[in-house]
Amino acid sequence: MTLVDSITVSEAGGLTFLDIENDLASAKISLFGGHVLSYIPKSDNQERLWLSPHAYLNGERPIRGGIPVCWPWFGEDPSNLGRQAHGFARNLLWNVLDCQLHDDIAEITLGLESTATSKQWWPSEFRLRKKIVIGDQLDISLTTENRGEIPFSISKALHTYFLVGEISQTTVVGLDGVDYLDKTLDFSKHTQVGDITPFAETDRVYLESPAHVQIIDQSLSRKIDIEQSGADNIVVWNPWTRASLLNDMDADDYGHFICVETANALANSVIIAPGASHQMQVKYNVSSTASSP
């Protein structure tokens, strides 16, 4: 089924997908989790996102790779009620609210609303919207609206897995001098010195993060510019050898991705008043470094 020119619907493994193919890029989105699985600009026809070869694409578990939505909490259950990590948005079926095509750029809006199912995990009345713009760059916005009568607090992240050629030749630039909490060291506070080149398990929440950071991938001769707004944190994650403990990832997969996540996490959770909303947005643009000095 075709929704609009360049956007078609497909099904596999009991899941429904949107397949986007325009003159600027191709992409694939799972309605389960409202999850972007693939993004390939036509400028070089190279995949930008990493998706685990063992990802559950049947709705049984969250999908490993791509761009998961962590919402309405990021990380472990903040209330210690035994609820799953990273919230429930990545485990629910999202609705297609709108699809448009403007100047070869596809704009897709997905949505979730509070239901009896969501209230099993979280009692608040909400409306969640995710707008995905697919062209020569990838833009994503996540808007949370409080439809209830009392304020609520959320933390959230776009947990993006970027495909890299080799993690040891990958550097995150733009966080020098920024304080961070290191989960691998009991969330102790440190200050970033220089750029980040992971050489061991990395799990850091950067505080008061800048609006722009960059991933330099020397192995694939490209750089990824990340521009974010409405987000106070950047999370950098790579499991390193702990990948062997994850049943939806091969032991050596850590060498081929890095997560640089746009987030409002931990103490930077957002309180939304009744009738109010909050938007978090990120833009990803990839270019070649082949001619760089």
Listing of model-derived features with the role each one plays in the protein:
Residues 150-153, 157, 161-233:
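Active-site/ligand-binding surface loops and adjacent short beta/alpha elements
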Residues 38-40, 150-156, 293:
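Short, hydrophobic/aromatic beta-strand segments
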Residues 4, 83-134:
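Extended, loop-rich substrate-binding clefts of extracytoplasmic carbohydrate-active enzymes
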Residues 48-91, 225-248:
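Hot-dog-fold acyl-thioester-processing enzymes
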Residues 58, 129-131, 268-272:
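Beta-strand-rich interaction surfaces with strong enrichment in secreted/lumenal proteins
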